[in-house]
Amino acid sequence: MARLRVYELARKLNMSPKELLQELEELGVNVKSHMSYVDEEMANIIIDLLEEDNRKAKQPSKPKKEKGEEEVEKEVVEKKKKKKITLKPDELKLDIIAEKIGVPQNKIIQDMFVKRGIALRPGQILKLEEVEQILKEYKIEIEIEEEQQTSVEEVDEFELLEKRYQELYEKEKDKLVPRPPVVTVMGHVDHGKTTLLDRIRSTRVAEREEGGITQSIGAYQVEVNGKKITFIDTPGHELFTEMRARGAQATDIVVLVVAADDGVMPQTIEAYNHAKAANVPIIVAINKIDKPNANVEKTKQELVEKLGLIPEEWGGDTIVVPISARTGQGVDELLEMILLVAEMNEIKCYPEGPARAVIIESKLDKKMGPVASAIVKDGVLKVGDAVVASNTYGRVRNLFDDNMRPIREAYPSQPVMILGFEDVPDVHSNVYVVESAEKAKEIVEKRLQRLEAQKQSRKHINLEELMKMMQEKEKKVLNLILKADTYGSVAALKNAINKLQSKEIELNIVHAGVGEISTSDVMLAAAVDGVILGFRVKVNNQARRLAEQEGVDVRTYSIIYKLVEDLKLALEGMLEPEEVEEVIGHGEIRKVFKISKVGKVAGVQMLDGKADRNGFVRIYRNGQLVFGGKIESLKHYKEDVSVVEAPQECGIKFAGFDDIHEGDELEFYVIRKVKRKPTFVEEQADQEQK
């Protein structure tokens, strides 16, 4: 037996790679991932050790002792420690939830995007599943108060439908089963995406498409060694990101295709940024290795330099598979790696009951009427089911598989064409099966009313709004999408923006590319609540319309100085104003009056400046501070006044302090809020040099 990779050894032991990695860690065997090698001698030792453990595990075990009182008490204490909050239906807003759980909004936004791939906005009205994800992240239980009567504005039944599946995933984990992974193939134009899918499906799709470039979206399912994989074929990555922006994630794994004779190109970078923003596992397929000028090692180097993807064989954690889609070389290994990643990520579903699915394509067919291509996520979709989508409803009249053969049922991860909707459903929306056609109609009508009511309030972040947003004190993040006319301009933009980095605010460049601002850029900005900055480029008409529709702020500039100045103003607006104390006057207590039902009042001679009724005062006695606080009342003779200036006399009652003596010195001051400027990297470096 020659040396083996960890996942190959796992097969021999009839274990999953994940289980074997855990066992190896307990045994003290140092391996990095499922792709790491184990030599023959070590493999034999591991096999012997694990087989011995299995034998011991099969032996009858001694009866377990009942838990002692201390253990029971400890469990009760632990349960009590778990925090629980109650929310009303109208409290499903990010700012309210942040206040209730004691975590700043910006911290929640950052954690949810980085750890769970969910893009949120300050003050956003949240879906139930988004609330549950937030509370799950911070280990807090939730209880939604039920109300006897709820209006259209208070409850979205689509959220309740989604919650049904969330609860199934939480409460019935033992019923979840593995499902086929859904894979999106991305990459630069002409790098071989369609040819790869063609090779996998063993059909000649590429030859029928104009110029060999994909012109339509489709989903296909193939079988590999008895296991199924579903592939979404998309022109570019607009579908992928638009689906994410609308909350309908269908993709489990991304295969990033890079040509070995061309290397990492602009659309490769763009595709990678979209996949990275979605927090989806990425497998790199280096294609066209059969070409004479193919250079796999150089391509790997570009993956490291341009994308930060380090291949596993170089000590990183990115699976890179050299292939030739034309000859088929390496394709079997790629499929094997897809199944391995699916197994490692434990892709599962709830296999029974009413189905939910994601629409990936929809249109109005002259003969068949409204049709939709979808991928089933959970349950079983059947002919005759009553269904709802975001904007329409219907009853499933016909189902067709990816080869356009009529079927009666569709199962998780299966691509299917659905006929029977009343109208063309929104692309990238979720589909749910409900109990009846009447209920479906009621749900959608209420949904449309709700969306219409919210339409005016729906908007994303723009540069001006950043001046009012997120006034918490933790570090803030601004997501940027940059487009410029040349790579030199992109480099100049990045350099200028990096100089605006500060301790208080992080500028996160989600994507930077060359060429006009497209719909793909807009959808990416919508997904991450980012701002698009263009330098010497135009916005195409379709992207402009989409930006207006999605509420994405798009700015274009011809002078880099103006872009930087606008950004500086926005960053300054993100910082909470600084409170600065300003001394406005001094005085001395010349007489102390005792007034019944009032207490002690100081007769004060103003020495300089003024005393402000809405300001503050400090009292010094023999050089020592004896009081600092507010002025309760300020009088000039018998009149209440707001200000007394030197050299006038006045009567002052101090808030909560009566221990005043003649001769006490007074210092009057006010607190002013001063606009705070970030300390930019460049300015900080200059100061340090000085």
From Swiss-Prot:
**Family matches, as InterPro entries:** EF-G-like_DII (IPR053905), IF2_II (IPR044145), IF2_N (IPR006847), P-loop_NTPase (IPR027417), Small_GTP-bd (IPR005225), T_Tr_GTP-bd_dom (IPR000795), TF_IF2_bacterial-like (IPR000178), TIF_IF2 (IPR015760)
| Identification of the protein by name | Translation initiation factor IF-2
UniProt-annotated stretches for the region G4 = 287-290
Q: Which UniProt keywords apply?
A: Cytoplasm, GTP-binding, Initiation factor, Nucleotide-binding, Protein biosynthesis
Q: Where is the tr-type G domain?
A: 178-346
Compartmental location: Cytoplasm
What superkingdom heads the lineage? Bacteria
Give the source species: Thermotoga maritima (strain ATCC 43589 / DSM 3109 / JCM 10099 / NBRC 100826 / MSB8)
